[in-house]
Amino acid sequence: MKLHLKIWRQAGPTAEGHFESIDVDDAVPQMSILELLDHVNEGLIEAGKEPFAFASDCREGICGTCGLNVNGRPHGPEKNKPSCHQRLVSYSDGDTLEIEPLRSAAYPVIKDMIVDRSALDRVMQQGGYVSVNAGTAPDADTLHMNHQTAELALDHAACIGCGACVAACPNGAAHLFTGAKLVHLSLMPLGKEERGKRARKMVDEVETNFGPCSLYGECADVCPAGIPLTAVAAINKERARAALSAKDH
């Protein structure tokens, strides 16, 4: 399988980047995008050239480390799949693949296709801590949570923090990410005391450092965890609830 690759090369955050063209003649349809980059890098190293820098870890779709733009789309052409699960079977012999970092004003490029996504970490940091009772662990049956609520919390906790939602959004909004966290945390038995304060701080952080949400829906289309667009509603719901409550909870 022959592919023409245009891969982003950028020495550092302040350096000017450019696409570097490479032709691959022996790509295999079962390869992932990351494995294709591994293959390219092996050839570069053998030739004494600098390999392309990109982020990856588990390659099982659960860590959120990998993240690339492929032909302008976060992760790749297949919906709701991370970069490590995007296979070359989606492409045809002779296709051109333009591979670059996730693009957002909130994600400065560190090198090549590695970006700094710590802006998402700062949203979570604003969530703070949760209060727990000291002493021995309580019996599980004393924490009342029905099955439907637990499933809803787990569905939203599935967010892997890859940041593709922000890169896909024309406004650069992080409302799907933040909404998923707020839904998950609001449903858990622990942390009720801090619910209001948590919502206020997280919403303030996301609206300060990311763009506004216009409900375009591109975020949900690329989310590897399949977080629904309805999660965005938690932003206004939790903010309104916090504004109407005189207490943190």
Please place each PLM-identified region on the residue numbering.
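Short strand-turn-strand beta-turns centered on an Asx-Gly dipeptide
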Residues: 8, 25, 70-72
